[in-house]
């Protein structure tokens, strides 16, 4: 079904069965297959390929040569009807690739809202990405990676399968991430190592001084005080009930399966 207000360039192909919402703009030489739903106000500039099952939300902008919802590159994939779900108001720049999930996981790749994916970023199968994140040029997420809210992944970075990147993290360019990165942490390198708290980012996002100081104390317990992980968690737990941000930090440590960058 194509909404009467949608604008589709005559050189583009929209297969029968696709659902195209109000005020959607599909520029020249795009392809949208029959198992795709595109929400209100979303724009495909030109030469965009969207395969399905894929659901794209409202007011996204997808630039030329992006490949959205293609089959994943996992060798176990055997053509199952897995999905890609994208939220609202994302900017997806040139040559970005986002793949559908696999049945070995939950079968869904999920991208939240208000994210920026710069040129040539890659989101592999079964990734789960939060809101208001930035992925710089050539940032690469392997399968099953989870990224929290308002994280920044630097250009040319690569994140190993199953790694978790916490809320408000900042990864420097060229980083190779093979373990989980706790919330609020700045890290860089090969292999990626922590070098502080994303203080400037936290200030911009409205964290008050007391909360930031509490996060710093949690960071020092984990990285600067010479404690084992279990001892650090016990020390951090003393402030977890008073400060929600510290509780988030502690919960992340408790749930980590790949281990924490140290």
From Swiss-Prot:
Pathway the protein contributes to: Glycolipid biosynthesis; lipid IV(A) biosynthesis; lipid IV(A) from (3R)-3-hydroxytetradecanoyl-[acyl-carrier-protein] and UDP-N-acetyl-alpha-D-glucosamine: step 1/6
Q: Which PROSITE patterns match?
A: HEXAPEP_TRANSFERASES
User: Which subcellular locations apply to this protein?
Assistant: Cytoplasm
Please give the catalytic activity noted in the UniProt record: a (3R)-hydroxyacyl-[ACP] + UDP-N-acetyl-alpha-D-glucosamine = a UDP-3-O-[(3R)-3-hydroxyacyl]-N-acetyl-alpha-D-glucosamine + holo-[ACP]
Primary location group: cytoplasm
Q: Name one GO molecular function term.
A: acyl-[acyl-carrier-protein]-UDP-N-acetylglucosamine O-acyltransferase activity
**Keywords of this protein's UniProt record, alphabetized?**
Acyltransferase, Cytoplasm, Lipid A biosynthesis, Lipid biosynthesis, Lipid metabolism, Repeat, Transferase
Q: What is its EC number?
A: 2.3.1.129
Quote a single Gene Ontology cellular component term: cytoplasm
One GO BP on record is: lipid A biosynthetic process
Do you know which InterPro entries this protein is assigned to? Acetyltransf_C, Acetyltransf_C_sf, Hexapep, Hexapep_transf_CS, Lipid_A_LpxA, Trimer_LpxA-like_sf
**Record note on quaternary structure:** Homotrimer.
Its biological purpose is as follows:
Involved in the biosynthesis of lipid A, a phosphorylated glycolipid that anchors the lipopolysaccharide to the outer membrane of the cell.
The cross-references to NCBIfam families, in alphabetical order and at most eight, read: lipid_A_lpxA, PRK05289.1
Q: Which family does it belong to?
A: Belongs to the transferase hexapeptide repeat family. LpxA subfamily.
What is this protein's name?
A: Acyl-[acyl-carrier-protein]--UDP-N-acetylglucosamine O-acyltransferase
Q: What is the lineage of its organism?
A: Bacteria, Pseudomonadati, Pseudomonadota, Gammaproteobacteria, Vibrionales
């Amino acid at each position: 079904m194509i909404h009467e207000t949608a604008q589709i360039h005559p050189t583009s192909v929209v297969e029968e069965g696709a659902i195209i919402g109000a005020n959607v703009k599909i520029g020249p030489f795009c392809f949208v297959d029959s198992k795709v739903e595109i929400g209100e106000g979303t724009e495909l500039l030109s030469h965009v390929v969207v395969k399905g099952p894929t659901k794209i939300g409202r007011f996204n902008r997808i630039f030329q040569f992006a490949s959205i919802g293609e089959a994943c590159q996992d060798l176990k994939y055997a053509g199952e009807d897995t999905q890609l779900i994208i939220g609202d108001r994302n900017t997806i720049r040139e040559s970005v690739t986002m793949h559908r999930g696999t049945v070995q996981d939950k079968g869904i790749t999920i991208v939240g809202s208000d994210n920026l994916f710069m040129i040539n970023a890659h989101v592999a199968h079964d990734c789960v990405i939060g809101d208001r994140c930035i992925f710089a040029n050539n940032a690469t997420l392997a399968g099953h990676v989870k990224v929290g809210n308002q994280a920044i992944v630097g250009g040319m970075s690569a994140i190993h399968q199953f790694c978790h990147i916490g809320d408000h993290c900042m990864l420097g360019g060229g980083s190779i991430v093979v373990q989980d990165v706790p919330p609020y942490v700045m890290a860089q390198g090969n292999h990626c190592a922590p070098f502080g708290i994303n203080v400037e980012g936290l200030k911009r996002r409205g964290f008050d001084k007391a909360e930031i100081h509490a996060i710093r104390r949690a960071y020092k317990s984990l990285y600067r005080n010479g404690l084992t992980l279990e001892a650090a968690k016990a020390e951090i737990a003393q402030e977890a009930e008073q400060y929600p941000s510290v509780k988030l930090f502690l919960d992340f440590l408790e749930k980590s399966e790949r281990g924490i960058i140290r």
